[in-house]
Regions:
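Canonical positions in the second alpha-helix
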Residues: 30-31, 64, 96, 129-130, ...
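Short coil turns that delineate tetratricopeptide repeat
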Residues: 36, 69, 101, 135, ...
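Register position in tetratricopeptide repeats
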Residues: 50-51, 109, 116, 150-151, ...
Length: 279
């Protein structure tokens, strides 16, 4: 392993293990200094900045798209040249399956960035390509479905959700299927899927959010509130969750409760404004 690769690995581990945002940013920027074509570093910088500087996060995500596409083309060219070689010239250390998996991972990461940029058609296409490169990535079926759902392509999204659920259980997939069925007017079927989402969910913040949304669609406001509150308590740094519970209280005419969460947002915004100035 080259010195550059070992240094990059060290910086990547440091970035992933630290809880300090400034240190994460510093590590990823150092990786870029070592390798300006590393798409993962740009991708990760976009993720970090998304908490407090939308302009910078968008910039880094867009740069990562260019880097991922460049890396994919490089892999394709290398794979094409390798496959054209006579068998006697091919290295036994190279497994074509590993190359396809590597390309597939690049496509998957590209899909994640497109999702972050709200470019859902491009995201779904990237996930489809990831699945073509590595059929073992069954979870791509779910990501394709969600991107299509966000792009209002409900019929195609439903197809991928059903295929995904035929291969593995997923409370999140049940939720999106329920939403599509409700949109199509299949009320009874959608209720079954909302209950499946609730029954199969776990005991974490994301599960509680899905339970809250499902109970709200089932008309049980008290349980919807219970799980929204629980979701925020388990992940108090997630600003989107706090906005969700504010919207919930406002929709149900509970302005005082909404105001209490607005205060949490105000405090967080003050902190984020300071971070934006210093980073």
């Amino acid at each position: 392993m080259s010195t550059t690769h070992s240094t990059k690995d060290f910086l990547l581990n440091q970035a992933q293990n630290t809880t300090t945002i400034s240190e994460k940013i510093s590590c990823y920027k150092k990786i870029i200094e070592l390798d300006c074509d590393d798409p993962g570093a740009f991708h990760s910088l976009g993720n970090v900045y998304s908490a407090f500087d939308q302009g910078k996060s968008k910039m880094y995500w867009e740069m990562s798209v260019q880097k991922y596409e460049k890396k994919i083309e490089s892999f394709k060219d290398s794979a094409s040249k390798y496959l054209k070689q006579p068998d006697t010239a091919k290295s036994s250390e190279i497994d074509p399956k590993d190359v396809f998996q590597e390309i597939g991972q690049c496509f998957y990461s590209l899909g994640e960035v497109y999702d972050n940029l709200d470019e859902y058609f491009q995201a779904s296409e990237a996930y489809k390509n990831a699945l073509k490169m590595d059929s073992a990535k069954v979870f791509c079926l779910f990501d394709i479905a969600v991107s299509l759902y966000n792009d209002d392509k409900f019929k195609e999204s439903k197809k991928y959700l059903l295929e995904f659920l035929s291969k593995q259980s997923s409370y999140q997939a049940h939720y999106f299927l329920a939403m599509i069925l409700a949109h199509d007017g299949s009320v009874r079927e959608s209720l079954v899927e909302f209950w499946s989402c609730i029954d199969e969910s776990q005991d974490d913040s994301l599960s509680d959010w899905y339970k809250a949304r499902s109970y709200n669609n089932l008309g049980n406001v008290k349980l919807a509130e219970k799980y929204l509150v629980s979701a925020v308590q388990k992940d108090p740094e997630d600003v989107d969750l706090i906005y969700d519970i504010i919207s919930f209280y406002e929709a149900n005419g509970e302005g005082q409760k909404a105001y209490e969460y607005y205060e949490q947002i105000r405090v967080k915004k003050d902190t984020l404004r300071l971070m934006k100035k210093t980073m």
